[in-house]
Amino acid sequence: MKENYFDTLKVRLFQAVDNVNRYADEKDCNRNHVNYGSATSIARVMNDFGHDVDLPVWDDGGFLRIPKIVIDGKVWIDYEKNQSKSE
């Protein structure tokens, strides 16, 4: 259950990052880049609220990928770790 606006932003950030990586998998460059813009905008608002948000990004043949989400020093989602478990 969402308790405050920060929790709402966190959910939206998770959704945007998931979309970034999903559209990279689907090779949809426009949606990949739009969702990256959304993720970084949400992260910036969270920074403005005083939280440290780290969204590392790398280029995968023209598609952006975000390997993990780190908020206030805690790794919330690690896509690389989850990917290696499924291989």
Q: Where are the regions a protein language model picked out?
A:
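Compositionally biased, intrinsically disordered low-complexity regions
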Residues: 10-13, 63, 77, 83
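N-terminal acidic leader/helix
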Residues: 2-36
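Acidic, low-complexity, intrinsically disordered interaction modules
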Residues: 22-73
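Intrinsic structural disorder/low-complexity segments
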Residues: 15-18, 54, 86
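Extended rod-forming repeat segments used as scaffolds/tethers
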Residues: 14, 25-28, 42, 79, ...
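Short intrinsically disordered terminal tails
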Residues: 1-4, 74-87
